[in-house]
Amino acid sequence: MSDQTYVEYECTHQTFRPLPRYPVRWLEWETDYPLVQLFWPEQTPEGWQEARREGYQYCAQTEHDQIQAMAAVWRYSEAAWEVASVYTRPEVRGRGYAKAVVAFVTATILGAGKRATFSTASENRAMQRVAERVGF
């Protein structure tokens, strides 16, 4: 049994602060697989399809033909979707890429009329700061 604790957040239209500094787009497995493989070598076509079946869709901020940061929307219920699987390349952390992908996913969730949720490990202060800056 894990002793890990999590901090849970919710963002609303009133609290949301979009951060349009970097362009972010949805990833398509068929065309973006080479980029995904460089960023996330463990991901397989089967794993990607399984994630899609479980309600995940991934987006990325790309620069210089590389994914700099990635996040997903997890459509876990009819009423609420979660910002999930946020990761930034270690060598480019602190540049706002995580905020860009989190804001992109959050805007998608709120635009669909769903509750936007987010959770992270209680000791992950960097991710908590990102969430708070976006309006969670």
Predicted feature residues:
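Conserved GNAT acetyl-CoA-binding A-motif
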Residues: 1, 109-121
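Conserved active-site alpha-helix within GNAT-family acetyltransferase domains
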Residues: 1, 99, 122-136
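Acyl-donor-binding surface of acyltransferase catalytic domains
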Residues: 1-22
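A short beta-loop-alpha structural element at the N-terminal edge
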Residues: 23-35
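A conserved beta-strand-loop-helix scaffold within acyl/acetyltransferase catalytic domains
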Residues: 46-89
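Short hydrophobic clusters on alpha-helical segments that form packing/core surfaces
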Residues: 83, 101, 105-109, 127
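A short, internal acetyl-CoA/4′-phosphopantetheine-binding micro-motif in the GNAT/acyltransferase core
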Residues: 86-93, 121
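Conserved acetyl-CoA pyrophosphate-binding loop and the N-cap/start of the following alpha-helix
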Residues: 91-92, 96-101
